[in-house]
């Protein structure tokens, strides 16, 4: 990974990790954030009535509810257990809240059983739905009041949170990893310290009453990522005296 003329890192977190764990000249490292397409995830996207009718048919328990969503495969470090405690704190004031846990349980059957037992223990059986792995995550996020990122370990980047922000849906996230870097740019008020569940509850209550304004994502875009990638290759080619990418394309 560190043998190239240049090494692209997808976040400051990964830059730090590489420098701390590999012998490499820091000048080789080039930060290039991952990006999302504004055509696929347009700001203020509204789902179709056809999709909504199908959704309510499949999940009637979500009709006329305040939807809070935690996407991500079901595993201990993704924070589904913290999410349940957040929902428990919210329903005291907003009993019409419904939490969606979106993600594949894979081989984590034991943890899934633990989560479902916690749902019963906390009296959340009418307020939580496990909807499994979904291809319509964009639509699900678009009907959500807030999307959560509660991973207990820092993520290299965290694509789902960026997709939500790009749609104009607020994100509450633990303040570490690549997700922190996204929110610093687009919604810094959504950051809370890792494990501070009461802070997540209080911020959720505040945002349900008055949703925050989100900056349009003009920073973490697919086009910008692609252009930056090409620029890295262009620079390497020029430094080696081999012309330019444009000339090579014509060959």
Question: Which residue ranges define each predicted feature?
Answer:
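Active-site donor-binding acidic/aromatic loop of nucleotide-activated sugar
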Residues: 107-112, 125-134, 140, 191
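Conserved acidic donor-binding segment of nucleotide-sugar-dependent glycosyltransferases
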Residues: 185-197, 205-209
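Acidic donor-binding loop of glycosyltransferase active sites
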Residues: 142-156, 169
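A short helix/loop element that forms part of the nucleotide-sugar donor recognition site in Leloir-type
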Residues: 42-61, 115
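Conserved donor-binding/catalytic core segment of Leloir-type glycosyltransferases
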Residues: 61-78, 84-87
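A short, active-site helix/loop in glycosyltransferases that binds the activated sugar's phosphate group
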Residues: 4-31, 36-40
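A charged, aromatic-enriched C-terminal amphipathic alpha-helix characteristic of glycosyltransferases
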Residues: 211-241
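Glycosyltransferase donor-sugar binding loop
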Residues: 36, 71, 98-113
């Amino acid at each position: 990974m560190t043998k190239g003329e240049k090494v692209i890192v997808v976040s400051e977190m990964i830059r730090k990790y590489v420098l701390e764990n590999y012998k490499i000249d820091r000048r080789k490292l080039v930060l290039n954030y991952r990006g999302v397409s504004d055509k696929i995830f347009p700001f203020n996207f509204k789902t179709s009535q056809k999709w909504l009718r199908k959704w309510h048919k499949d999940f009637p328990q979500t009709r006329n509810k305040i939807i809070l969503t935690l996407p991500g495969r079901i595993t201990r470090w993704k924070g589904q257990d913290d999410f349940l405690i957040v929902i428990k704190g919210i329903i005291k004031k907003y009993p019409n809240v419904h939490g969606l846990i979106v993600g594949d349980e894979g081989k984590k059957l034991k943890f899934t059983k633990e989560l479902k037992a916690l749902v019963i223990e906390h009296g959340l059986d009418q307020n939580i739905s496990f909807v499994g792995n979904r291809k319509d995550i964009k639509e699900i996020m678009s009907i959500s009041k807030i999307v959560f990122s509660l991973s207990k370990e820092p993520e290299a980047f965290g694509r789902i949170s960026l997709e939500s922000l790009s749609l104009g849906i607020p994100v509450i996230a633990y303040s570490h990893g690549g997700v922190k870097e996204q929110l610093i740019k687009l919604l810094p008020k959504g950051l809370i310290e890792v494990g501070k569940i009461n802070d997540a509850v209080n911020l959720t209550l505040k945002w349900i009453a008055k949703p925050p304004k989100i900056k349009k994502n003009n920073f973490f875009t697919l086009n910008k990522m692609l252009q930056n990638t090409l620029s890295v290759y262009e620079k390497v080619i020029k430094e080696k005296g081999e012309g330019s990418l444009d000339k090579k394309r014509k060959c």
